[in-house]
Structure formats: C-alpha cells, structure tokens
From Swiss-Prot:
PROSITE patterns: RIBOSOMAL_L21 (PS01169). NCBIfam families: L21 (TIGR00061). Part of the 50S ribosomal subunit. Contacts protein L20. GO terms for biological process: translation. GO terms for molecular function: rRNA binding; structural constituent of ribosome. The gene is rplU. Keywords: Ribonucleoprotein, Ribosomal protein, RNA-binding, rRNA-binding. This is Large ribosomal subunit protein bL21. The lineage of its organism: Bacteria, Bacillati, Bacillota, Bacilli, Lactobacillales.
Amino acid sequence: MSTYAIIKTGGKQVKVEVGQAIYVEKIDAEAGAEVTFNEVVLVGGDKTVVGTPIVEGATVVGTVEKQGKQKKVVTFKYKPKKGSHRKQGHRQPYTKIVIDAINA
C-alpha cells in the first residue's frame, strides 16, 4: 500500500501521494521553488496516523511547477424592462505543485 497524506491548503483539504501533481489556491512562490506543507491532517499507508487536529512532526514537500489562472467564469445580471445589465468575468489564480516527499 502506498503512503498518502491529507493536507490543508487554501482553506481546503487535499489527498496527496508522492509524484502526484495537484492544483491549489495561489501560493506566493516562483516556479521551481520548494514548498513545505506543515498542516498534515492524516498520514496513511501501512500504519495510519490521524492528527488531532494535525499530525505532529509530519510534513509534505513539493515543488512548484507553474503558476496560472483557471478558465474564465462569467456572471451576468439583468433587470427586465429597465435597460440594466451587468457582465463580469473572473479568472481564479492557482499553483500547480508536484509532491516530492511525505515525511511522517
């Protein structure tokens, strides 16, 4: 059974394994930089360790592959018979990270 972990980042919990690429909310780091996640909620594998609320001493290390923006989401507000309408677009920034190691 391969080792996996559940980490908290960007207000969400993400299940990660070594070698996996994940997309998370934007992290201020350049492409190629190393990122360490200290908020590890669970480490699983042969022996599962559940944190209360986090696992002490456990870290997940990853490398930033790229920074980007998601596809555009368009919102449109319209009031009939008033000639009022409003169109707005938004692109959420993200960071793509490749997981290098899970240290428990």
